[in-house]
Amino acid sequence: SIYLRVDWPWAVHNSPLVSMGWHPESGFINSDWKGYDEGMIVYILGLGSPTHPIDPAGWTAWTSTYVWMDYYGKPLVNFPPLFGHQYSHIWIDFRGIQDAYMRGKGIDYFENSRRATLTQRSYAIDNPAQWRDYGPNVWGFTAVDGPHDTTVVIDGRSRQFHTYSARGVAADYVMDDGTLAPTAPGGSVPFAPEIAIPALITMREKYGDNLFTNYGFLDSFNPTFRLPIQPHHGHVVAGVGWFDGDYLGIDQGPIIAMIENYRSDLIWKTMRRNPYVVAGLKKAGFTGGWLGN
């Protein structure tokens, strides 16, 4: 009943794009959902509403802001942090279904997320900035906390570190300060299990209880940050690196949900039966696969 009461057209401030937020004191913020990211599900839900739907032109406007570029030999819709390639996919099974944009590219959004995952690993193997521990099974860049906002010289090289940041790598943007996130490979298990699962296992074995304790993986870690200064939060383990002290639901949820989607399609199967999701996908122009024509 909450979903049926949502006034989606009200949230379309700069038509036909959906606004990212509104404050009672100041009104709409100066940002809309555009450029490929986690906002995909916002448009699907808005389109599928049986009571207050948005105009399908919103989806066309949304896809018109995509950035399609090659990265590490793979053409894809770019978005640097992996969360943008994961969050909508937790709920919606994009395997085998395509909108007009993806039909034009010859892939689906699931394959796009697979490519994004593969390019992150390729970047870590390449390791152009020579951060510690990066490699085939130690990788993962997304929006997480970091150790400190500071610039220091380590082994003769200037290193800039950050606290919270939308870390990520793509053809048009790289934000990398040596901070890695287990939720990045964890949320990509269905897309590329052959690299995501070994990454999780390696992180668990290599860093032990520093990274994986009572409730699973901590938010993030940075093997390069081994400085004798107090981090913004978390702690430094001598000779190993910095480890965050927080468990975040927005980390644990994607790990658990995507592993279960990989195992049993549980969430995907449930959402494929939701008439509003199906309606939203069809209004966005999706066809094929489990949706049919």
Predicted segment positions?
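Ser/Thr/Asn(+Pro)-rich, low-complexity disordered segments
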Residues: 1-293
